[in-house]
Amino acid sequence: MTVEVHLVTPEREVWTGDVQMVVAHGTDGMVGILGEHAPLLVQLAIAPLRMQLEDGTWLVAVVDGGFLHVSSDDGVTRADVLAASAELADQIDVAAARARLEEAQARSTADDELAAAEVAKAEARIVVAG
């Protein structure tokens, strides 16, 4: 059984396709989605989203929070990933991501949630891009 994935942001559809498995980081921990999964709604963390394609290779994206909604209808399992922003690994400029990380770290303080989120996103982008 496969999972039909739709990775979207408010601006665009980032990726759509069938996968064997989805691995996502929720705010309460990791979740794995296979075919015939029970309905589920998960709040996503700023983190990598991993999708195992039908040929066994992995497609990785970074998502900036959002939600993962899993539904099953007539034997079709669908995973809708609704993120504030998302990028596939091959779309990330590693040098630019490192520069953004350094900028965010320089602005970050213990009390600044926005800067902490920027640091988390920059770190996730670097991890995803390799």
Where are these regions (language model features)?
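Compact, glycine-rich, soluble single-domain proteins
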Residues: H6-R98
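Acidic/glycine-rich phosphate/pyrophosphate-binding loops and surrounding catalytic core
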Residues: D80, A86-G130
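N-terminal export/targeting signal detector
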Residues: M1-E4
